[in-house]
């Protein structure tokens, strides 16, 4: 049978874990109580039925605060969870064209590009040349210019069209919302 040691990340020392002989103490409401002996601070914490939490261990003397540690950890956890919910992962969506892409297909792909940019995703537009199409790169450049003007209100060009092997690539970033 295997046993695993799961190390829990503890960011703050509390109560008897604090080793400094003197500390700078902050009260429950955030008021400064000055520099006091550790023993006195622990006694005060016990009287008020709260924990003594080391906030800044590297300061001279270390800064400690009287607080309900369980409530403090819960608030921190809640803040981290809300921050995680608010962040949006920006993806790069790719739409591929060919120099001979017809108007109907062009409109469908344009609609998809608009949707991607509206959702806040960056888009990569790839125009692939095959065989003799390489001799007519100006057709591809015209198509990318047309895309650029059609998508002006949804996003701005992040990377101007450039050749990468047999492909012409252009990157668009969504416009910042006001």
From Swiss-Prot:
Keywords tagged on the record: Cytoplasm, Initiation factor, Protein biosynthesis
Transmembrane regions: none
UniProt-listed InterPro entries: T_IF-3_C_sf, T_IF-3_N_sf, Translation_initiation_fac3_CS, Translation_initiation_fac_3, Translation_initiation_fac_3_C, Translation_initiation_fac_3_N
Entry keyword annotation includes rRNA-binding: no
Cellular component GO terms held in the UniProt record: cytosol; membrane
PROSITE patterns found in the cross-reference section: IF3
Domain of life assignment: Bacteria
Single Gene Ontology MF annotation: ribosome binding
Entry-linked Pfam families: IF3_C, IF3_N
Subcellular location: Cytoplasm
GO biological process, one term: ribosome disassembly
Subunit structure: Monomer.
HAMAP family membership: IF_3
UniProt similarity note: Belongs to the IF-3 family.
Chain's role: IF-3 binds to the 30S ribosomal subunit and shifts the equilibrium between 70S ribosomes and their 50S and 30S subunits in favor of the free subunits, thus enhancing the availability of 30S subunits on which protein synthesis initiation begins.
Protein known as: Translation initiation factor IF-3
Provenance organism: Ralstonia nicotianae (strain ATCC BAA-1114 / GMI1000)
Lineage: Bacteria, Pseudomonadati, Pseudomonadota, Betaproteobacteria, Burkholderiales
Gene name tied to this protein: infC
């Amino acid at each position: 049978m295997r046993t695993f040691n799961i190390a829990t990340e503890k960011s703050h020392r509390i109560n008897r874990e604090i080793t400094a002989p003197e500390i700078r103490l902050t009260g429950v409401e955030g008021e400064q109580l000055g520099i006091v002996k550790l023993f006195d601070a622990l006694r005060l914490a016990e009287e008020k039925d709260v924990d003594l939490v080391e906030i800044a261990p590297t300061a001279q003397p270390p800064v400690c605060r009287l607080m309900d540690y369980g409530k403090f950890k819960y608030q921190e956890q809640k803040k981290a969870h809300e921050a995680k919910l608010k962040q949006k992962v920006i993806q790069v969506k790719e739409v591929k064209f060919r120099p001979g892409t017809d108007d109907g297909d062009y409109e469908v792909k344009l609609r998809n590009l608009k949707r991607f940019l509206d959702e806040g995703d960056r888009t990569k537009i790839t125009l692939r040349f095959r065989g003799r199409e390489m001799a007519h790169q100006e057709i591809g450049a015209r198509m990318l210019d047309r895309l650029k003007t059609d998508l002006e209100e949804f996003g701005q060009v992040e990377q101007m069209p450039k050749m990468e092997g047999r492909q012409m690539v252009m990157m668009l970033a969504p416009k910042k919302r006001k």
